[in-house]
A protein has these predicted regions:
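Conserved small/polar residues in nucleotide/adenosyl-binding loops
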Residues: 1-5, 479-480
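M16/MPP (pitrilysin/insulinase) zinc-metallopeptidase core fold and M16-derived inactive scaffolds
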Residues: 3-68, 119, 136-142, 257-291
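M16/insulysin-pitrilysin zinc metalloprotease superfamily fold
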Residues: 26, 68-102, 266, 284-344, ...
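Acidic/histidine-enriched alpha-helical segments
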Residues: 35-41, 93-111, 122, 176, ...
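Non-catalytic, conformational "gating/processing" segments within enzyme and secreted inhibitor domains
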Residues: 103, 117, 154-185, 401-403
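Hydrophobic, small-residue-rich alpha-helical packing segments that form membrane-like cores
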Residues: 103, 119, 123-125, 136-137, ...
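Proteolytic maturation boundary segments
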Residues: 176-264, 268-270, 329-333, 337-340, ...
Length: 481
């Protein structure tokens, strides 16, 4: 794992993603030429399939490589996989001819990904991140850079950012952990930390008092989609490994869960205001240095105004009046049941689940105390957190500033969308929406409130064809045994 795509300069746009490709095109121990097999063919001879068990991805802030389904009973294969990790870390060949060959591969990837929605998202960045490094940072990069960068540029980028202090290794499987750690130290002993390394900068995202609004259309987009963000300060890494952080995450989970239940209820009405809607909380679009409470909706072509107003109304209703005790009881019970299930199934946890947790710990400092501790904590914590705590948090999520709206839809003659001014006016009206508290109409009563009295068998008939017996009861029910 490596932290860095956002660190590209304008003349390097796309090099982090390009470098990810090059990691499979020849390394010190897997040259992929007449002297030896490359990583992909070697792995596939061992049952490690490219794309399924051997892969990588590059996002704005990190590149993650993955090797899975390694036969741990074959120590030679395990040792060779450690060499692959070593080579990715510091020994990718970056040969001229391989770089030129990969330019064509990435051009084709760029063409295949260049959908209407991606074009809109790329164009929206400048509005969503004004005067920010994030304003132009899609991992695929600039096709002009991909076509023309000098060979030395990617070698310099590799040397600058692929280094031990920015790298992490996660290994999970049927192994001896101490022996594996010793092997890693031996394999990686020649990977040296650079002298005077470049600073790894984490770029902030500024607050905004007035809404940031982007409206984008494209002929390839089929239906409108609405994304509304309420930006929040990101939780400092230093506060994540605390009981307070767990409590906040639990309360946040409850708020999102209950709001989504309300939105889902609206979607199931006879004439729903949207085709789909949801609420969430996480990183603000592409940036890790800012978080956001988000509302999303998909609508019919002529239903943008109604969909947008409805999700804002439901967020405002939750902010103003909160959630009911019965809603919270259900959400809490479902959450605790899910935790209990995870705890009971803990011995069946797949390696990939552990890997995901450890990767999140390395990249985002998410705590990893284990399901035993988390289950114990939830049992102690959840019953003692009242719905009022959730309602107080909801008031903080829906803010009057730091609002961002991304509206995307099809480009069709005669199709009209709300203007930026109209959207801004709607946002300002939120606090004065004419709303009533939510009524929880879900009954906790049993389906049948009266005791059911037993009936009598009034007739009995044998079925010689199937060898069964048909019974008719006094309440007219037919039973076949």
């Amino acid at each position: 794992m490596y932290k860095r795509q956002i660190l590209e300069e304008p003349q390097q746009r796309g090099l982090a993603h390009f470098l990810e490709h090059m990691a499979f095109n020849g390394t010190k121990h897997f040259p992929g030429d007449e002297t030896g097999l490359g990583i992909i063919p070697w792995c596939e001879t061992k049952g490690i399939k490219f794309g399924t068990n051997l892969n990588a991805y590059t996002s704005v802030d990190q590149t993650v490589y993955n090797i899975s389904n390694v036969p741990t009973e074959n120590q030679n294969v395990v040792d060779s996989c450690l060499l692959i990790l070593h080579d990715w870390s510091s020994a990718i060949n970056l040969a001229d001819k391989e770089i030129d060959k990969e330019r064509g591969v990435i051009r084709e990837e760029w063409r295949s990904r260049n959908s209407g929605m991606l074009r809109i998202m790329t164009d929206a960045q400048a509005t969503m991140y004004p005067d920010s490094k994030y304003a132009d940072c899609m991992p695929i990069g600039s096709i002009d850079v991909i076509n023309n960068f000098p060979y030395q540029d990617i070698r310099d980028y590799y040397a600058k950012w692929y280094r031990p202090d920015l790298q992490g290794i996660v290994i999970v499987g049927d192994i001896n952990a101490e022996e594996m750690e010793a092997k890693l130290k031996e394999v990686f002993k020649d990977v040296k930390a650079p002298v005077n390394p470049a600073e790894r900068i984490y770029y902030p995202v500024a607050d905004n008092q007035e809404p940031l609004i982007y409206i984008g259309t494209d002929k390839e987009v089929a239906n409108p989609s609405i994304n509304i963000f309420f930006k929040q300060d990101a939780t400092p890494d230093s506060l994540k490994n605390t009981i307070s952080y767990y409590a906040t995450q639990y309360v946040l989970n409850m708020a999102i869960n209950m709001l989504n239940s309300r939105l889902n209820e609206l979607r199931q009405t006879a004439n729903p205001p949207f085709t789909g809607a949801g609420a969430g909380y996480g990183e603000y679009f592409l940036a890790k240095t800012k978080e956001a409470f988000s509302l999303t909706a998909n609508s019919k072509i002529d239903g943008v105004d109604l969909a947008m107003k409805t999700i804002l109304e439901e967020a405002e209703r939750a902010r103003r009046f909160g959630f009911t005790e019965t809603e919270y009881e259900r959400a809490r019970a479902n959450y605790m049941q899910a935790m209990e299930s995870a705890y009971n199934e803990r011995e069946k946890t797949k390696s990939g689940n552990y890997v995901d947790e450890y990767v999140n710990n390395f990249l985002d400092k998410e705590p990893i105390p284990g399901i035993e501790f988390e289950y114990m904590l939830v049992q102690q914590m959840a019953p003692n957190i009242p719905v009022t705590a959730v309602n107080e948090l909801m008031k903080q999520l829906v803010t009057d500033n730091n609002q961002v709206v991304l509206l995307a839809g099809p480009q069709k003659e005669g199709l009209k969308y709300p203007t930026k001014e109209e959207i801004a006016a709607l946002l300002k009206q939120m606090s004065s929406f004419d709303l009533k508290p939510y009524e929880d109409k879900v009954s906790n009563e049993p389906l049948i409130s009266e005791d059911i009295k037993g009936g009598k068998i009034v007739s009995e008939k044998a079925d010689d064809v199937y060898g069964s017996t048909k019974l008719v009861l006094s309440n007219c029910l037919l039973y076949t045994s």
